[in-house]
A protein has these predicted regions:
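Bacterial N-terminal signal peptides that target proteins for export
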Residues: 8-28
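C-terminal segment of classical bacterial N-terminal signal peptides
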Residues: 35-43
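Patatin-like phospholipase
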Residues: 42-87, 95-407
């Protein structure tokens, strides 16, 4: 039985004209009817009124591994996240969370990965042809100019192209929808922040291939080659908006959980590689623009700042320690986080939906583009993946690695 507002008003008017036990009985009846009406008309009222919590993950190179520790604490305390935005390393972790990667799987990947190899474009010289070896020698001993050829940016030796990084990112996001995708359709809506190297403007990526978007967001100028998306040449978003609080608010968040990363600057004797110098530049720039964003914090927002003293943006080999520091910082704020907790049943539903395994992906087509330096016959032989096959990412990665190691592609 459902009582509308008009009927309830009539019943209350009738109470005025009654007395004694009759009034009491009628009042109890109307109160019960009101409870039934509320339950039947608005069965999910509590859920609808729940605040939408946005998660903001700052950039900071290796320091961003601390984000995983924060995610562990958010899960333990049943804090449902409605929106995610990240910059640079924050976008790597944020995209993994938004596309359904398990937090423990993220932790394992970060700890077990060989980051020196991932950040290297070196190839196995034993597999190079004589011509490719000669070309590699010319790259090493000369030709350090930046130029444009056939409309593409040609970068000098020493700039990481990210050949080995992209497969790692794709594996992190394999539980998400096929690319290209609308990032609003992810398990948790996502935004990836990069910067346009030509204009200096922040670029918020909300669609396309998520691995490519993240690869752009972490392209430290002078270290990683820029990434072209929609005609714009994109680099690390940390130079324009390292703490994208404004982006998450625009997505619809009522309150924010903000994870800031404060990096120690390195001394001169430690600045001995392009990666170290690039990390130093980003650390300086991100500190400046993060301060601007933090001025917009409200009393409803929660700011988590891991104590990262002694660690730098290039400490990728210290994943375990950095994750622990993020976890420690979040645990200090559990009293505040508890206010955002939902019931065990509700969080279990949220977690199950976020981590739901996607169906197997079927290959629809395979297209191979070969320039004048490559061999179409060789590529046809190496690439065994065919239309109609169930995608085997391990096999595909091996095929790509073999092709890359020839030095011709």
């Amino acid at each position: 039985m459902v009582f509308g507002p008009g009927l309830l008003s009539v019943q209350f008017m009738n109470i005025i004209s009654t007395t004694g036990k009759q009034r009491a009985r009628q009042l109890l009846f109307i109160m019960g009817a009101l409870l039934i009406a509320t339950h039947e008309v608005c069965p999910s009222l509590a859920e609808e009124r729940r605040e939408k919590i946005g998660l903001v993950l700052a950039g900071g190179g290796a320091l961003g591994m601390a984000h995983v520790g924060v995610l562990k604490v958010l899960e333990e305390n049943r804090v449902p996240i409605a929106y995610v935005a990240g910059t640079s390393m924050g976008s790597i972790i944020g995209a993994a969370f938004a596309t359904g990667q398990r937090v423990d799987a993220m932790e394992q990947l970060l700890i077990e990965s060989n980051w020196d190899e991932i950040f290297s474009d070196s190839v196995n010289r034993d597999e190079l042809s004589y011509r490719s070896k000669a070309g590699r020698n010319r790259e090493i001993y000369g030709d350090t100019k930046i130029s444009v050829k056939n409309g593409k940016l040609i970068t000098p030796f020493g700039v990481v192209q990210g050949q080995r990084l992209l497969p790692v990112l794709q594996r992190l996001y394999e539980n998400g929808p096929p690319s290209p995708a609308d990032f609003n359709e992810f398990r948790i809506p996502l935004r990836v922040v990069a910067a346009d190297i030509e204009t200096g403007q922040a670029v918020v990526v909300s669609k396309g291939d998520v691995a490519t978007a993240v690869r752009a967001s972490m392209s430290v100028p002078g270290v990683f080659a820029p990434v072209e998306i929609d005609g714009r040449l994109l680099v690390d978003g940390g130079i324009t908006n390292n703490l994208p609080m404004d982006v998450v608010r625009e997505m619809g968040a009522d309150r924010l959980i903000v994870v800031e990363l404060n990096a120690d600057l390195q001394k001169r004797d430690s600045l001995s590689s392009p990666l170290a110098i690039g990390g130093q530049i980003i650390s300086i720039l991100l500190a400046q623009n993060s301060a601007i964003q933090k001025k917009t914090l409200t009393k409803e927002d929660i700011l988590i700042e891991p104590n990262l003293t002694g660690y730098t943006a290039v400490d990728f080999g210290k994943a375990k320690e950095l994750i622990a520091l993020g976890e420690e910082a979040a645990r200090r704020l559990i009293p505040q986080l508890k206010h955002l907790s939902v019931s065990e049943a509700e969080y279990a539903k949220f977690k199950a939906a976020r981590e739901a395994t996607i169906k197997q992906t079927t290959v629809e087509f395979v297209t191979i583009h070969c320039d004048k330096h490559g061999s179409k016959e060789f590529l046809d032989k190496v690439v065994t993946t065919k239309p109609g096959d169930i995608l085997d990412r391990n096999a595909l990665d091996e095929e790509v690695e073999r092709i890359y190691n020839t030095g011709d592609y």
